């Protein structure tokens, strides 16, 4: 009887320590399809127009073309940005009068930025709607839930 009781206690402990059984495991392609559906729904529900998309699911709209000087991998970029979730909650922004500095192609920012910033020129502005696989994927943080589609408005201030 004690042995049976010990086994039951052990099983309860093991199952209570496991990950939430409500989590759904998706393949990358399934998640991308879901993200694209969310993005297209967001665009439609908000009556947005003028967006283009890439095969990787990145949707974008160039608001200002800039001066025809495009960034290349290895360039240092100064950008101003605002990031938000599809529900409109802002999770990050660059400081006023202090652009964010990054090196394009270095991997220090999410893939969606690495790809999207090559679509605008110096002094240009773009809106990027980034599927989770080009952002933080299944990783969550305090302000960004796992598998979140992210929206960024980015102005490329300077290329060095």
Per-range role (PLM):
Residues 1-10:
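Sec-dependent signal peptide recognition
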Residues 12-16:
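C-terminal motif of bacterial Sec signal peptides marking the signal peptidase cleavage site
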Residues 17-160:
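Cross-family detector of peptidyl-prolyl cis-trans isomerase
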């Amino acid at each position: 009887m004690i042995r049976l009781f010990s086994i039951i206690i052990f099983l309860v402990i093991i199952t209570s320590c496991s990950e939430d059984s409500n989590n759904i495991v998706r393949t990358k392609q399934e998640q991308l399809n879901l993200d694209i559906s969310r993005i297209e729904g967001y665009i439609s529900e908000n009556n947005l127009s003028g967006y283009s998309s890439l095969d990787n699911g990145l949707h974008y709209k160039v608001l200002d073309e800039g001066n025809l000087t495009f960034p290349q991998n290895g360039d240092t970029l100064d950008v101003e940005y605002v990031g938000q979730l599809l529900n409109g909650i802002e999770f990050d922004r660059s400081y006023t009068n202090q652009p964010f500095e990054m090196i394009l192609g270095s991997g220090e920012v999410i893939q969606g930025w690495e790809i999207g910033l090559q679509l605008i020129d110096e002094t240009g502005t773009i809106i990027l709607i980034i599927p989770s696989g080009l952002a933080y994927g299944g990783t969550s943080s305090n302000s960004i839930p796992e598998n979140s589609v992210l929206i960024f408005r980015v102005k490329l201030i300077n290329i060095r």
